Amino acid sequence: MLKLKHYFKKFWAPILLCVGLLFLQSQSELALPDYMSDIVSVGIQAGGFDSAVNDVLSIETYNHLYVMMDEDDQKEFEDAYRFVESADLDEDTKEKFPQAQKQGIYELKDLDSDEFEDLEDIMVKPMLMVTSIDSMDVNSEEYQKQFGSLPAGMTPYDAIAMMDEATKEQMFSQIDAQMVTMGESTLKIAAGNGVKAEYEKLGCDSATVQNEYILQTGVKMLGVALAGTICAVACGFLASKVGA
């Protein structure tokens, strides 16, 4: 034991470095499946949109989302966005969202991480509801079953806006119960598709957004894999030096 202690004192730095490199290698290997999952779920299934929070919203969609919220959420939603007239849009926004030049848009303000997470929690349910309603064919059996009794000229959003808070709360409770069974991954994909639909509505090239997300995530994945490989090689080299 004393002899081992003597050799350990001589090589303590390389040994500790090997332990650190092995830890980094294991972390990189554990991270790779997450990146692959993001490429499949977000990059492919959700079109590259990984959040329920839109950077921009059309006036119509903003109003539709608004009526799907209770009063507290409406206040936070209002505080998170600002309306920009079409004449005041910057060139990058005009280029990315051509349809915004016809009407103006609501732009997301600069939020800190906590504010963004709170807004995302607020917007998931309304985004799913709006996407579901907007994707329905007005002549379909499902639409007629749910909204066929509405007076002529009244939309589902008009009807929901006329509800009192108690009726809204009852409706939201039923939707919450359905959302619980969907799972976090499914909710994320569905919300991402809602954001994608809104971007396309404003003229954005969603295919470019998707390709950029897949490319960026793929590059990160390759970087993590390369880092893990370097750690493995370096650890093997140091271990051989210590063993020699």
For every predicted segment, state its role.
Residues 1-32, 38-221, 231-239, 243:
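Membrane-integrated ABC transporters
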